[in-house]
Amino acid sequence: MLIYDSQYTPDEYAGVTGRSKVGWGHSTYVAGCELARSAGVGQYVLFHHDPTRTDANVMDLERRAQDLFAPSIAAREGLVIHLDETARAAWAA
C-alpha cells in the first residue's frame, strides 16, 4: 500500500491553471500512480487533498487515478484500512 500526497493535478502543479506549485512540498495524483505502479504496490491511497476541493472534486481525482492505476482510492474522513497478515508482517520487517 502506498499512501501518497496527491494534493494537485499535473496542471495545477505545473502552473498551467494558476501559480506553479513546484517546490511547495506536495505532489500529484499522476506521480502517485506512477510510483505505485513502479513499486508494485497493491493499493494507492490519494492523501492530503487541496483544502479548497469539494468532496465531488476529490471523487473526480479518485476516478482519474483509477484510470491510471485501478486499485486507487481517495482518503476521506472516517476511512479505515485493514491490513491482512502478509501486510502486517512486511510492515514489521
Model segments located where?
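A short acidic, often aromatic-flanked loop/helix-cap motif at beta-alpha or helix-coil junctions
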Residues: 78-83
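Cap/insert and terminal regions of metallo-dependent hydrolase folds
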Residues: 1-77
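Short, surface-exposed amphipathic charged segments that create phosphate/polyanion-binding patches used
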Residues: 84-93
